[in-house]
């Protein structure tokens, strides 16, 4: 049985397979930066299950996602940045940050923050490391370039995923209908108004 966990500051309807976790309203970028902290607050509940996957609320499932995504540590190649030269990928280059990636130590892929997971043990292990790093940095007013995604990419360089999913699982909506884009969509990263969401 699959259980869906929803982290929200709003009141929402619940059902037997949905668990609601209330979070406080905070200004951008805290809701995304602190997502791994939210996961750790629910670690006791999450640990009841064999696998745990996270995906952004603005993702749309348009095809079957099945056992092919099951592995210990799963990450999804970024629909754009994975194909850029390593030195041009937008890792956090601030040496004061725990998400820092120096030139020459980039990973094989750059991963999107929108869909990741794996065995519950490995997912919570990653979540704990990232949550601790975020908490430590916030005490010094340090926020990485791409927030939780920057921390995740640093972690995945040090702990490579056992499965790298193609951009089919974080398919940029603006690529729909593009005959030159070599992937079929399974999970779509929907277009959004960034200014509206962050204000």
Residue ranges and their predicted role:
Residues 1-9, 53, 75:
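Short, hydrophobic beta-strand segments that form beta-sheet elements in well-ordered domains
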Residues 5-13, 57-64, 169-170:
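Short, polar loop motifs at secondary-structure junctions
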Residues 5-6, 52-56, 117, 163-166:
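A structural signal for short, well-ordered beta-strand segments and their strand-loop junctions
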Residues 7-50:
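Active-site-proximal specificity loops/subdomain of glycosyltransferases
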Residues 32, 36, 57-59, 145-150:
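Conserved glycosyltransferase catalytic-site signature
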Residues 36-86:
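GT-A fold catalytic core of metal-dependent nucleotide-sugar glycosyltransferases
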Residues 68-122, 129-130, 149:
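PAPS-dependent sulfotransferase catalytic domain
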Residues 105-193:
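Catalytic core and acceptor-binding pocket of nucleotide-sugar-dependent glycosyltransferases
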């Amino acid at each position: 049985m699959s259980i869906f966990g929803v982290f929200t500051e709003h009141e929402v309807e619940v059902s037997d397979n949905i668990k609601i976790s209330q979070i406080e309203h905070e200004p951008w970028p805290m809701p995304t930066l602190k997502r791994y902290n939210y996961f750790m607050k629910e670690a006791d509940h999450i640990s009841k299950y064999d696998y745990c996957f996270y995906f952004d609320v603005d993702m749309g499932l348009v095809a079957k996602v099945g056992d092919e995504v099951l592995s210990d540590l799963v990450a999804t190649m970024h629909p754009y940045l994975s194909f850029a030269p390593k030195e041009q990928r937008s890792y956090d280059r601030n040496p004061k940050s725990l998400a820092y990636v120096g030139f020459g130590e980039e990973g094989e892929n750059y991963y999107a923050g929108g869909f990741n997971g794996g065995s519950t043990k490995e997912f919570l292990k990653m979540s704990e490391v990232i949550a601790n790093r975020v908490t430590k940095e916030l005490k010094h007013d340090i926020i990485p370039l791409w927030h939780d995604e920057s921390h995740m990419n640093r972690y995945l360089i040090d702990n490579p995923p056992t499965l790298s999913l193609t951009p089919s699982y974080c398919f940029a909506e603006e690529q729909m209908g593009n005959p030159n884009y070599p992937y079929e969509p399974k999970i779509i990263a929907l277009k959004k108004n960034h200014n509206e969401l962050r204000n």
